[in-house]
Amino acid sequence: MSKFAKICVVVLCGITSVFCTSCENMFSVDYRIVGSWQVSHTYLNDVEIDSTIYLGYAPQTYYNIYADHVMSVMARYGGEYRESSFAFWVADQKNKTVNFQYTFYGKVYDFTADILKLNRNEFTIEFTDEKGDRWRLQMFSRSRH
């Protein structure tokens, strides 16, 4: 192998390792979860529902998730959209879960959900609440069209 070919191989290996390292973050939950998501389908114990007293889980609710682990939840209440307060999220890449904590209209929401699907257009989570009811929220991206 010529000296030029060896240099080319070394350079290509270096570029590939740098590229793979920087792309690794693109596949992490922390990277992919960031965006604006709209709840399109809500399931309670495997039955799709159109409304619920838990505004944070209702269809047409927005989860605006930011990279610094802050978020906002916006839901319809009294014909207007209202926004949550004290909203945070933390993802666990290894266990494929996400914890959401926020206060919305006097109710504190604090739950850890299994991530069933997360890609650039769809985000589906499932969790069991303190009463033992199983919720599944299917959300679609509002920020990546």
What is the meaning of each model-derived region?
Residues 12-15:
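Repetitive helical segments and hydrophobic/amphipathic motifs
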